Regions:
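Juxtamembrane intracellular "pre-TM" segments in multi-pass secondary transporters
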Residues: 1-4, 187-218, 400
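Short amphipathic helix-loop junctions that connect adjacent transmembrane helices
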Residues: 28-45, 233-250
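Central cavity-lining transmembrane alpha-helices of secondary-active solute carriers
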Residues: 50-66, 257-268
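Conserved MFS/SLC helix-loop-helix module at the cytosolic interface between two early adjacent transmembrane helices
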Residues: 60-97, 274-277
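Structural signature of the two symmetry-related core transmembrane helices
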Residues: 77-92, 171, 281-296
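Cytoplasmic helix-loop-helix junction between adjacent transmembrane helices
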Residues: 105-143
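Intracellular juxtamembrane helix-capping segments at the cytosolic ends
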Residues: 115-127, 319-332
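Symmetry-related core transmembrane helices of the 12-TM Major Facilitator Superfamily/SLC fold
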Residues: 166-183, 372-388
Length: 400
């Protein structure tokens, strides 16, 4: 059995490569469509929507299947599968010559998804119970750091070598991730392998009969929806606050990245707090303070004030996912980790699909400022629901 610290160090590198490889490409896909693939400016919004949503659609369907296969045949093989298929999809992305081919590449990418759930499943099986919060907080912090680093690398590489080169770099790092799994990560132990629970033949539908896990899946979908509500209009909103200033694109990217910087710092601290105070309590607090922060974020009329709220949002929000992942780990049997994180990923993908649609509708009907207050209402309602459901009652693990 591997030392959990070694596993955490390797997975940290893995997650960093995975995160920045994704974010150094995704923000620039509309530019890739127009500059490299010849899409007309009037059609770019339509093609951007098709290209983005195609991945979510496939990954939503496949995530529970990959999770079930991981529990049956091992987490390591599924992680390797995801790394290599993602590497192939990025490589193909650098070769495409039409928007239709790019859509097919994104479909392949959706088929390949599942690396993050496998990272979570492997870490929760290796981590000591008393270090679970620290490990998941560290992983979330690194994921956030990669999401900040990615657009910076993507912009630099695109300026120097063109956008196609960025796809090949991403393919290289995902292939490197696959090699790390092949040579350095051992299949995690399965404490329940010979346990009587195996006789129960648990299915993914059993999760929906467990109130706590069902509620956490719903919470995961809501949180992801809130994240993506703002995505279609955030850069436009920042531009409207900035006005006519030099280096507008650079300034916009800097302001957006502030929440990622603060989140990378705060996530491990939230994880430690969850270990001491209880993850459900920390989840509730983090959602509540984020809801307050989103309401405040809709108030500033200057870029400087908005930048301060953006940094604060990262501090508040970064406690949500580590707590959510830890709750799922604590209340799931060891031989069900792959499936539960696959289901959580599916719930989050559904939120990812709903968020941009809702954000676009709100911005069109009520204006961009309304988005912040709707996000606040959703988050505050979720925090009150969690508080009244689990106040003074931190459920003990019940394995169906």
């Amino acid at each position: 059995m591997m030392n959990w610290k070694v596993v955490l160090a390797i997975l940290t590198c893995n997650i960093l490569f995975m995160s920045f490889s994704y974010t150094m490409l995704i923000p620039f896909l509309p530019l890739y469509l127009t500059d490299e693939l010849g899409v007309l400016p009037g059609d770019v919004h339509l093609w951007s929507g098709i290209v983005f949503s195609s991945t979510f659609l496939v990954s939503t369907i496949m995530a529970p299947i990959w999770g079930k296969l991981a529990d049956a045949h091992g987490k390591k093989p599924m992680a390797i599968r995801s790394c290599l298929f993602l590497s192939l999809s990025y490589f193909c992305g650098g070769l495409v010559t039409s928007p239709e081919q790019l859509t097919l590449m994104r479909l392949l990418q959706g088929f390949a998804y599942g690396l993050w759930p496998m990272d979570l499943a492997i870490m929760t099986l290796y981590a000591p119970e008393e270090k679970l919060g620290f490990c998941l907080g560290t992983m979330q912090g690194v994921m956030t750091a990669g999401s900040v680093l990615g657009p910076l690398l993507g912009g630099i590489l695109s300026d120097l070598f063109g956008m196609r080169f960025s796809f090949f770099i991403a393919a290289f790092f995902l292939f490197l991730n696959g090699l790390m799994f092949i040579f350095f990560i051992k299949e995690p132990p399965d404490p329940g392998k010979d346990d009587a629970r195996k006789e129960h033949h648990l299915t993914q539908l059993d999760v929906l009969r467990q109130p706590l896990l069902r509620n956490m899946l719903l919470c995961g979908a809501l949180i992801q929806m809130v994240i993506f509500i703002l995505q279609p209009v955030l850069s436009t909103y920042i531009t409207s606050l900035a006005g006519d200033i030099p280096n507008l694109t650079l300034t916009t990217g800097f302001v957006i990245s502030l929440s990622g910087v603060s989140g990378a710092i705060a996530a491990p601290l939230w994880g430690k707090a969850g270990q001491k105070k209880g993850f459900i309590r920390i989840l509730t607090i983090s959602i509540f303070v984020t809801g307050i922060g989103e309401a405040l974020q809709g108030l500033p009329s200057t870029l400087a004030a908005f930048s301060l709220t953006q940094f604060t949002i990262g501090l508040c929000f970064s406690g949500i996912n580590p707590a959510l992942n830890a709750i799922m780990a604590q209340h799931t049997p060891p031989d069900f980790k792959g499936r539960i994180y696959g289901l959580l990923f599916t719930a989050q993908q559904l939120g990812s699909m709903a968020g941009p649609l809702l954000g676009g509708i709100l911005a069109t009907w009520w204006g961009m400022k309304s988005i912040f207050f709707v996000m606040s209402v959703i988050l505050l309602a979720a925090s009150f629901w969690l508080y009244y459901t689990y106040h003074n009652r931190d459920p003990k693990p019940v394995w169906f």
